[in-house]
Amino acid sequence: SLNTDLRKVLFGKMTVSDISGEMSVAGGVLSLDRLGLGVFGGKATASGSYSTAADPAKPALKLNADIAGASFQKTFEELEMVQKLVPIFAKTGGDYSLALDMRTSLDSQMSPDLQTLTATGEIRSANIRVQNIEAFDALAKALNNDDLRKIEAKDVTIRFAIRDGRITTQPFDLKLGSVGINLSG
C-alpha cells in the first residue's frame, strides 16, 4: 500500500497534477482507491484497477471517475481516445463534469483497445458552445440564417454508453440558434 502525493505526472500528451490518494499492488494488480487529481483543467476523483494478472500483454483497466470543471478542448488535446471517439470536442468550448464507469484492455501503447472498451456515464455542462461544423455552416447558408452556424446549450446532461468502439446517447436537448433540437443516437 502506498499513500500518494505527486505534484505533476506526464502521460503522453496528458498532464495530471496534484495526485493524492491510496494505491496498492498485489498479485499483478495495481488498485487505486479514491485518488484525487487535477486533469483537463478540472479536478477528479478516481477508483479502479490496472491488472496484468490475466494477460501481461493486454493489461485490463477498470475505472470509476468523477471529473468536475474540465475543459472540452483540453480533454481533446490531451486524450487520444477522445480524439477518436468524440472528435467534435475539438470544436467545443466550455467546461464539463463527468461521471464515468469504464472497462477496457490496453494496447502496447497503453491506450484503450476500442474494441474491448465498455463504459457508461453522464456528462454535464452549464454552457456548451460548438461552432465551425461544416454541416451546420451549410444549413445556415442554405437557410440564410447565421444563427444556425453555432450550437449553444445551457444546463445540458447527456447520458451515454460506449460499446464496441461506438458511443450512443440517450435523448438530450440543444439549441441551434433560436431553434430547439432533440438529439440521441
Q: Where do the protein language model's features map onto the residues?
A:
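Small-residue helix/turn framework positions
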Residues: 1-15, 20-185
